[in-house]
């Protein structure tokens, strides 16, 4: 099937080129220009045939095409009465026609691509649009960069506007910050659990070339049976069911996989605390006792507690909380790091004198012995939501945010949370279930050696030594990262904007990309050439016809915008020359024109080769 998809992808690209060149051909003939050849592809011809004075050919390099019109590329030509000195005097030549007729011919190619895009998007619209992951078009934030989080933006917040414009998805924030260097966001915080709903705004300087991606969209974290749990998964005995959605972990409402990864990789204990008549949860750092400053008395007390807890490990590997905790679990003081230049991780809320620890990682404790024993290993507390068939149905993207926010049922969740850490917790409330605490395992212990071997084989194929070393270093670090050994997916939504909206959005994105390239905010290495386009179309065919229609429309529209740019060699460059003739009412000096065209032709070829090599490098690693 892969070969079939590749053939279909190449065919789709050929159609895009054919439509563009056909636009030039039809209008050129209509205004009386003599067309010498019509080619799909460049280089030596694989097939050619002359029909009606026009040589139709298919080149051996299939990425592109051209229409050769008489007199367009020559300064001198022989006519019936001898040598013709000017391209303007060539019968039926390109320059023999008025500038307005030439502009019609030049515009016809991009216009044909625009019409193809309109057709593709219209069929897509009438067919109901395409399926996208909810996170791709979510106004709700799933993950936030620390720079924005410090300004008050949190996961779960709904963004209303970005720099004065309606917010559609995380791509808006990335492109806006890329071009303008700052973000002005109007935000709505829904009333999750006991948090009151409110609206507010932030204004912050943000450079994605320095900080990276500002945020990502919220996602349903759904467990399906398509990818079964691995044999050594920590979740193997957790009674997880198909269509369970992860909604809460260690005191955090979940909106993205990034949050889960952060919770697993941070060395924190989930602590239930009593302070006077108030009970609350707080994530507290688990730190090695060897990095804390103890008086001899406190050190001996901790060693005694270690003995009572049955912990036989060395002092250098003993974990604890950075507090002085008496035998009943009360906080009697706070400990500091031995090395002031290596500060301790910050707690979610600092514990105070007289606070009492009631539970660690969802397990009740009676005193310091239980506390010390439980903090040696982090076990995550997880609440899942069993999704009903109605909740799994695909909805229109316009209604998706409202449904997502409403899917967190505070009353049922609070029933479980209010009794968490007790000897008889509430394990089920409405669609929610509290799973038994789960201890993550290192990735290397969860997944088979075959998975590691496959990734090592991928690394060996990377030709660039620096990138290969970076990949291997990342792989080595990933091996030890805590994992639940589970694959979670997002829900699909139906994305079906009108063809006009699609055309407008793609045009804006194309111009934004070009602006980012010119200003240096975007590297050319992120662009795709013909090989990349074929690869994208190949992926589209493997997903479905709707996806192919979208990519054909998008690429066709991008081709139209690109060709209309006022750059010599492109259609837009020739249009600019024609407009110059109209304004000045003087013929062009073809020698000067050629001097302008030659270097730009050379640069275009170099750029084309660069993009092709970039595509091949990405494709083959």
From Swiss-Prot:
Active-site residues?
A: 21
Name what cofactor the protein needs: Zn(2+)
Q: Under which main EC class is this enzyme filed?
A: hydrolase
Q: Where in the cell is it found?
A: Cell inner membrane
The cross-references to SUPFAM superfamilies, in alphabetical order and at most eight, read: PDZ domain-like
> In which residues is Zn(2+) bound?
20, 24
According to the UniProt entry, its GO molecular function terms are:
metal ion binding; metalloendopeptidase activity
List, in alphabetical order, the GO biological process terms annotated in this UniProt record. Answer: proteolysis
Cite the entry's keywords alphabetically.
Cell inner membrane, Cell membrane, Hydrolase, Membrane, Metal-binding, Metalloprotease, Protease, Transmembrane, Transmembrane helix, Zinc
Q: Transmembrane segments in this chain: where?
A: 103-125, 561-583, 596-613
Q: Does the keyword DNA-binding apply?
A: no
Q: InterPro entries from the xrefs?
A: PDZ_sf, Pept_M50_Zn, Peptidase_M50
Enzyme Commission identifier(s)? 3.4.24.-
Topology in the lipid bilayer is annotated as: Multi-pass membrane protein
Protein family membership: Belongs to the peptidase M50B family.
Q: What is this protein called?
A: Putative zinc metalloprotease CPn_0344/CP_0416/CPj0344/CpB0350
| Organism expressing this protein natively | Chlamydia pneumoniae
